[in-house]
């Protein structure tokens, strides 16, 4: 059977003479029209260090595809730099870009009848955007992560971009001077690669490796190391074989694969954004997955890796300690992974992990032994209560007190909140509420890294809570609760909180509660009026109109008709 199952529609027969004529102009020869055409979705961009090394990887992917007997066709996808847009109106486009990336890959691959695709991405939304497209198309596909940045260094300490965000809070609190602030800025990001802790990009790449959609070890490699380029070329060979065997995403992205991904995310201390993105991918793939599934798995899986933002190490250290395969082998041995789940190579998870040691190396403490975890349970807790009937996500790693009750400090935007923190107007015991930053209300669920980093930098990380219908960066830690649903814009209870109201965050009881009577809430709800959309044209206007609740993954194609 021919391997060009889809592309033959544009390459075979006399009627396709004009099609072949154009393909000859881009490098096809007489013998190439029976080969599978494989897309190379290249996220290269000089917008961000996360993506600036991707073109070299795309060229290696092209070379690998040609050597394996396929015809590559490269096309570009966009990216937004979360780190650069953070704290600005531009961050509203970040989650939107996930949908644009998905739409663009789907459009290019289906429009050109490609037989498969190798997607190469770096910054946060590149990963879920690509995987949503892969799930929509259900053609053989593999994801290549651009790799992590190496840590910066200053005064004997490893730095990440989060160090720079926290330095702003320290500077505002008078803890560091101009010279130290500038030194941290100059040293935080030393080269190419995605943000170096177990932030969102590294979390999602780890999840994809756990799901079998990326090659072993590839999710923790440094962007600038030769092994990353070698792994990319190997990914091309694996993909062509998957095309020949017709190994499809629907065979890999099963319920078992999602449960494996959640277990790994808990074990490595991953980002809250993984909840949103995995829900979106599952929704697209038609896999039943709810926000409650994260809580079920959280209770079973310990945090095994001592990684930033709340821990000591960065992702290259995890790679040196055995990477995601080592973590997965430990989970498999304790019955917390589905070993029979399929991977893109055609092997099962158990077969991939067969030769991995049962325990991590003794001469490191990045990956902790099973009997001495960083935390006995997972760190991403799903909270519910009258403030979040559909659920909210709390990241409780690095938190000394997982519960608090305090007066609400209410802000209608991230900017207003940050100004108050930097002006010293937030005190220990306060519960900060940032609302109208949800999928529809923002729109786009901006990440609150600037406010949370300012809180940490001011020394209030253990004594101030923050609740939002927006999101958090993977670099955030502290007593923070995001993804509150229903969001304020659609009349969720978070819209009804008044300044000074008593609010409870209790991660132990998984409770998020506004401590006012039902009668008072009913009165406030009766007087609440929906705000006008902030944008009524352009992509933000379209997004706000189409996007679903964060509890469903904030996807834009649910119940379109």
UniProtKB/Swiss-Prot annotation:
Superkingdom, taxonomy of origin: Bacteria
Pfam families recorded: ILV_EDD_C (PF24877), ILVD_EDD_N (PF00920)
Pathway connected to this protein: Amino-acid biosynthesis; L-isoleucine biosynthesis; L-isoleucine from 2-oxobutanoate: step 3/4; Amino-acid biosynthesis; L-valine biosynthesis; L-valine from pyruvate: step 3/4
Gene3D superfamilies attached to this UniProt entry: IlvD/EDD C-terminal domain-like
SUPFAM superfamilies: IlvD/EDD N-terminal domain-like, LeuD/IlvD-like
Keywords: 2Fe-2S, Amino-acid biosynthesis, Branched-chain amino acid biosynthesis, Iron, Iron-sulfur, Lyase, Magnesium, Metal-binding
Catalytic machinery residues: 473 (proton acceptor)
Enzyme category, top tier: lyase
UniProt-listed InterPro entries: DHAD_IlvD/Edd (IPR050165), Dihydro-acid_dehy_C (IPR042096), DihydroxyA_deHydtase (IPR004404), DiOHA_6PGluconate_deHydtase_CS (IPR020558), ILV_EDD_C (IPR056740), ILV_EDD_N (IPR000581), IlvD/EDD_N (IPR037237)
Note describing how the cofactor binds: Binds 1 [2Fe-2S] cluster per subunit. This cluster acts as a Lewis acid cofactor.
EC number: 4.2.1.9
Record PANTHER family: DIHYDROXY-ACID DEHYDRATASE DAD, DIHYDROXY-ACID DEHYDRATASE, MITOCHONDRIAL
General function of this protein: Functions in the biosynthesis of branched-chain amino acids. Catalyzes the dehydration of (2R,3R)-2,3-dihydroxy-3-methylpentanoate (2,3-dihydroxy-3-methylvalerate) into 2-oxo-3-methylpentanoate (2-oxo-3-methylvalerate) and of (2R)-2,3-dihydroxy-3-methylbutanoate (2,3-dihydroxyisovalerate) into 2-oxo-3-methylbutanoate (2-oxoisovalerate), the penultimate precursor to L-isoleucine and L-valine, respectively.
Stated family: Belongs to the IlvD/Edd family.
Subunit structure: Homodimer.
Name of this chain's protein: Dihydroxy-acid dehydratase
Organism per entry: Rippkaea orientalis (strain PCC 8801 / RF-1)
Lineage of the species this protein comes from: Bacteria, Bacillati, Cyanobacteriota, Cyanophyceae, Oscillatoriophycideae
Originating gene: ilvD
